[in-house]
């Protein structure tokens, strides 16, 4: 077996799979280290991909030729576009997935890279020399050399499961944790913290009274995540919706002292936006019910995931809770819910490439950086894998900023501000939402992926054809024009100002849709419907996009002012507080400095003026 690689990726979850695949696409000799190949691509918690903000990340991973979108399309059994009634900028594609189909599709994808080897075993220690990573050691003593290592351990890093009064070391239920790597991090001086997450009990769907719950169908037709998926062919299912009751809340209140979160057994912080059911009852006790989504875990699997009742209460209490919920009174619990604590690294220890500042060649992605969610992990994995391969090969860095995409927003939030709780992506975190839409991820990022060398031949050809078709369709819509009087004959009420308006102009009106302009100009009928959607969205947002483009240009000017080698003690006019914060965090740019707490606009002005003076000095002496 080969013992030396360009890149080694530790962990076969969503971050690890994307990291290994990204490194392999760049051409790096890559190894993926995992306890068992059978668990690669496993969905540890909810059987779903995407959602608000998260769906944007999946589309961005797909735009860079990542795996998650295509794998979700292969395993998806219910697709829904969330926020469909709102504007395109905040719509979120989501898919319920068959766990077995998803994992199988991911494993096939991983096996499809000839330069990607899978090594089964537990990574026990990092190896390094002269400030740079040199490889890893497994628990069985085997050593593997590498120019770059990506760690994506998820909840396995010194993982500890809690169920009622019991607790035991584990990375997932019935799977061993990764214990040795934490010692390596501590030996290197990394600041480690503890976070917590949880999962609900699993139910036998054959024992649920489906007639007592509301049924929720998916979209028809289903809209795929990946632009390379022509249509969804997997059979589609419905999900159920029920609610907790006052009786449920009484059971929880009577036993909340037995919850590890409230007994003092768990001290770490859990995800704010995915609270346990006991947290909901304690913090929102005035509500008469909390919604529960009953999500089947597979087409041929009776297991149902009750989304909304994550808990670590004792098993007998969980059974008592289920008996109080409509439709679940006689359900059989296949596996209890539980909470899990795990180590994470302070993400402020990272560069925007996700390389650590302390050890060159070491990259981190996923929950180890303090995030929560499959999609957040996948996006980080892709960025870390790209940069690990580029680092190993002596290439340029792959950095995505806040105007590039949600993956840039997330990484900047992490490395600039750090975290106090598990980080989850929302559309509200992005300043440039109008340009960072789920529908245009490929238009924003695929060209950048092509330049980096991570986009394959199939996507490259598809992207070229799509962009040409979009350009032609937009040009056609802009070339066709009509007067207000002529428009009135077609039922369109425009201001009678005598000005001709193009089809593109008409589409900018909120009440005018593509079908109406196509009825006026039959030649628009030759435009592919998928392309027409993009033209209409671009028209609707046209004026706002022009304004946001100016904002992005100003942002990029600040991002171009580098601070890497600045001696803040030599910058006159800075307050002691600003100087201390800048020294502590060492931001890369003036833009990043502005996103630190306590750095005022005045301090930014002083920094910008100082940099301009230094630049003039270098030019005059150069």
Curated annotation (Swiss-Prot):
One of its GO terms (biological process) is tRNA methylation. NAD(+) binds at residues 270-284. One of its GO terms (cellular component) is cytosol. SMART domains: GIDA_assoc_3 (SM01228). Its cofactor is FAD. It is found in: Cytoplasm. It comes from the Bacteria. Keywords: Cytoplasm, FAD, Flavoprotein, NAD, tRNA processing. GO terms for molecular function: flavin adenine dinucleotide binding. Homodimer. Heterotetramer of two MnmE and two MnmG subunits. This is tRNA uridine 5-carboxymethylaminomethyl modification enzyme MnmG.
